[in-house]
C-alpha cells in the first residue's frame, strides 16, 4: 500500500520550514520536539526523500523540500478555505478579526 501523508505531518513540515527549526515549530504548534521530529522523520521516510538539511543552527529545505513546501502550503490553504466555507454555509461566523489597541495610560 502506498504511503499516506497525514495532515498533521503537512502542518508540522510547513511550520518547520517557516520557522527554520524544529524547536520553533514545536512552540508554534504546541507540540513536543520529539513528536515534531518523529512526524518529520516519518514524512521523509514515507516520501523516500530528505526534505531538510539539518544543521546545528536549524534546518533549511532541500530541493525536494522546496518542491514539497510549495504543494503543502497550497494544501493547507485549501483546507483552511474549505473549513471556512463549511462554517459559512452552516451560518457560523468565519474569518479573522484583528484587534488593535493604543497605549494604555493609568488613571491618575
Model regions and ranges:
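Residue cluster at the C-terminal edge of the helix-turn-helix DNA-binding motif
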Residues: 19, 28, 41-50
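Short helix-boundary/capping micro-motifs
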Residues: 14-32
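Alpha-helical linker/hinge and terminal dimerization helices associated
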Residues: 46-47, 68-90
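A short LG(V/I)-centered, amphipathic sequence patch enriched
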Residues: 44-63
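N-terminal winged-helix
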Residues: 34, 81-84, 90-108
Amino acid at each position: 500500500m502506498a504511503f499516506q501523508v497525514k495532515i498533521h505531518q503537512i502542518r508540522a513540515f510547513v511550520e518547520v520550514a517557516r520557522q527554520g527549526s524544529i524547536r520553533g515549530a514545536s512552540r508554534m504548534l504546541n507540540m513536543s520536539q520529539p513528536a515534531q521530529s518523529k512526524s518529520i522523520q516519518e514524512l521523509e521516510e514515507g516520501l523516500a526523500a530528505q526534505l531538510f538539511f539539518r544543521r546545528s543552527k536549524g534546518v533549511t529545505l532541500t530541493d525536494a523540500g522546496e518542491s514539497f513546501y510549495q504543494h503543502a502550503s497550497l494544501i493547507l490553504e485549501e483546507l483552511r478555505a474549505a473549513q471556512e466555507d463549511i462554517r459559512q454555509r452552516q451560518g457560523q461566523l468565519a474569518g479573522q478579526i484583528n484587534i488593535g489597541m493604543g497605549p494604555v495610560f493609568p488613571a491618575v
